C-alpha cells in the first residue's frame, strides 16, 4: 500500500520523533483519524465507530498499549466490550497500516506514516515507556544487505531498539551523555 495521505503531521514545537512531555496528543489523534478515514475511502473499508474508538485509544499517548490495556480503556466507554472485539479492531487497523505491533512488548502503537510502504524502526524508551517510529532507509538497506550476504531473506524487517528518549536523559546520566557524544562523533 503506497497511498499519499493529505493530513499533515504535527510540525509544532515539541512534536518531534519523541514529542515533549507537554505535547498535546489532540493533533496526533486528529491526524490519525483523518488518515484512517482517507484510507478507508480509498480502499472501500469501513471505519466503524468501534474501530475509530480503538484507534483513538492507541493514539492517546505515544506509549505502546497491550490489547488488554486498550480493552480496559474501551470498557470505560463501552462496558460490555470483550477481548475479541478489541482484537478484531486491532487486526483491521493493522491490516490498513494505521497501527504497528511492537512484538517485544506485545503492544500496539500508532503508525506515523500510514498509507506508505515502509519498514519501521522503533525506539522504545526504557524509562518512560514511550515509543517513536523512525524511518531510516540506511538501516533497512544495511539489514537487507547483511541478511543477503549470509543467504537470508528478510520477511519482516521491523527493528525494535530500547534506550532513553531525549526527555528521559538527565544531565547527571553520564553513561547516556557519553553514548550520545560517541554516536555524534
Per-region residue spans from a language model:
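N-terminal leader segment of winged-helix/HTH proteins
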Residues: 1-46
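Basic amphipathic alpha-helical segments that dock to polyanions
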Residues: 86-96
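Non-DNA-binding regulatory cores of transcription-related proteins
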Residues: 95-185
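Short capping segments at the starts of secondary-structure elements
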Residues: 60-66
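A short acidic, leucine-rich amphipathic alpha-helix
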Residues: 69-75, 86
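Pre-recognition alpha-helix immediately N-terminal to the DNA-recognition helix
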Residues: 52-57
Amino acid at each position: 500500500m503506497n497511498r499519499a495521505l493529505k493530513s499533515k503531521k504535527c510540525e509544532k514545537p515539541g512534536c518531534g520523533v519523541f514529542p515533549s512531555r507537554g505535547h498535546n496528543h489532540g493533533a496526533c489523534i486528529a491526524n490519525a483519524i483523518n488518515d484512517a478515514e482517507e484510507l478507508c475511502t480509498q480502499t472501500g473499508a469501513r471505519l466503524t465507530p468501534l474501530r475509530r474508538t480503538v484507534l483513538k485509544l492507541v493514539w492517546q499517548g505515544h506509549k505502546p498499549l497491550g490489547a488488554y490495556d486498550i480493552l480496559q480503556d474501551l470498557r470505560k466507554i463501552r462496558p460490555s466490550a470483550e477481548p475479541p472485539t478489541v482484537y478484531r479492531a486491532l487486526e483491521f487497523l493493522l491490516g490498513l497500516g494505521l497501527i504497528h505491533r511492537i512484538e517485544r512488548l506485545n503492544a500496539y502503537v500508532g503508525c506515523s506514516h500510514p498509507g506508505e510502504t515502509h519498514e519501521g524502526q522503533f525506539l522504545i524508551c526504557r524509562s518512560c515507556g514511550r515509543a517513536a517510529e523512525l524511518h531510516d532507509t540506511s538501516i533497512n538497506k544495511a539489514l537487507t544487505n547483511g541478511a543477503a550476504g549470509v543467504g537470508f531473506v528478510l520477511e519482516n524487517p521491523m527493528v525494535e531498539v530500547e534506550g532513553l528518549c531525549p526527555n528521559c536523559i538527565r544531565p547527571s546520566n553520564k553513561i547516556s551523555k557519553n553514548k550520545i557524544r560517541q554516536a555524534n562523533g
